[in-house]
Amino acid sequence: MRVSRYFGTDGIRGRVGQGLISADFVLRLGNALGRVLAQGRDTRPMVLIGKDTRISGYMFESALEAGLVAAGADVQLIGPMPTPAIAFLTNTLRADAGVVISASHNPHDDNGIKFFSAMGEKLDDATEAAIEAAIEAPFLTVDSEYLGKVKRTRDAIGRYIEFSKASVPRGFTLRGLKLVLDCAHGATYHIAPMLFRELGAELVAIGVDPDGLNINAGVGSTHLETLAATVRESGADLGIAFDGDGDRVLMTDAQGRTVDGDDLLYVLARAWRASGRLKGTVVGTLMSNYGLEQALGTLGIPFIRAKVGDRYVHQALVESGGVLGGEASGHLLCLDRATTGDGIVSALQVLEVLRHEGLTLSQALLGLHKVPQKTVNVCWSGPARAAVEMPEVRQALVEAQAAVQGRGRVFLRPSGTEPVVRITVEADDVVLMQQTLDRLADVVRDAA
């Protein structure tokens, strides 16, 4: 496996103004991308740039633009748009690459850079390696007659709305359904309410007033308590929450109970199996609840686990010929409808199943019985990867695994996007699960 100097599991991410997430580095990053794309061609490459609603996005947009133009690449500025919208637009506008400035579900003082290929897919390892090598080379400014040009794309919202609506049948409607939509003050704030209203839903929209600083703050897919309370207070049929860049979706049922990515995978897999839409293997991750695997097995649906990260789920789907996969966090991949995880498109697929079958969300989940599972994040001041190598942590992990042997699973892993260690314990008994989790988390905290 290639060891990356700059790229993490989902692009480059960190605290604004520190390390790689600085204007000068992003300037060099844009220049490196432009040089890689220009290799072996006579015409200027074209790159789309989108962003979420963080205030630092303006700074990094300008830096990327300058670096690309200096390398001789044309740029189209999309503005605030969901990450999957940039993937779609990169493909449909025939761009050579797409770039998204976002830190997804992280707070406003983080930011990051994600890349898409010309086909709207995550970059492969070889392209990432070429960009990293170009970053280390001297900055290139081409002669003035070869500098890139910049323009702003005006019809991006309409294009993406039509793409999203095309992911469900022509006669699909949300009339008679009351929804609460939480857009996390993020990239879906102006698109998702418009789209769901066009489809006929009665809508209560929250998290739709971004100010550059409030993205993911107490709202969105990482703070479902806000959505749940609004669903109960408004008497809605269900709630839908996106994260800051719109590539994740979670839901709540009419009682405000959380419906996570494992739940949504079950709803889709069961219905698609019955309709003949399901192809190949359903792909989850090492963190997917064992109850999901059991429920799919009962239905005769093959299920495999990939490493944590939507790029690994995507890779496993391609290798197995599957079309459906995802993570409990809400990254869902419906590869017969979109090239990457798309919160809006995934939500529409779930709603289409519910409308077609005449079921509520809670009714659609009656065949799924999940094993008690809980995850805690322990802050780690240094490189989080070092935590799993510490002798006392490794010993505590062995003891935790022994405690649940035959009754559950234990996972300890460094986050690929945040300075935390994630600890997950799954067991058939909730008391055993909590005790095992507490003991292991205490050891990790003491070692931090």
Swiss-Prot record:
GO BP annotations listed: carbohydrate metabolic process; peptidoglycan biosynthetic process; UDP-N-acetylglucosamine biosynthetic process
Enzyme Commission number(s): 5.4.2.10
This protein's UniProt keywords: Isomerase, Magnesium, Metal-binding, Phosphoprotein
PROSITE patterns: PGM_PMM (PS00710)
Top-level taxon of the source organism: Bacteria
SUPFAM superfamilies: Phosphoglucomutase, C-terminal domain (SSF55957), Phosphoglucomutase, first 3 domains (SSF53738)
InterPro entries associated with the record: A-D-PHexomutase_a/b/a-I, A-D-PHexomutase_a/b/a-I/II/III, A-D-PHexomutase_a/b/a-II, A-D-PHexomutase_a/b/a-III, A-D-PHexomutase_C, A-D-PHexomutase_C_sf, A-D-PHexomutase_CS, Alpha-D-phosphohexomutase_SF
UniProt xrefs under Gene3D superfamilies: Alpha-D-Glucose-1,6-Bisphosphate, subunit A, domain 3, Alpha-D-phosphohexomutase, C-terminal domain
Binding site for Mg(2+): 104, 243, 245, 247
Main function: Catalyzes the conversion of glucosamine-6-phosphate to glucosamine-1-phosphate.
Name of protein: Phosphoglucosamine mutase
Organism the protein comes from: Xylella fastidiosa (strain 9a5c)
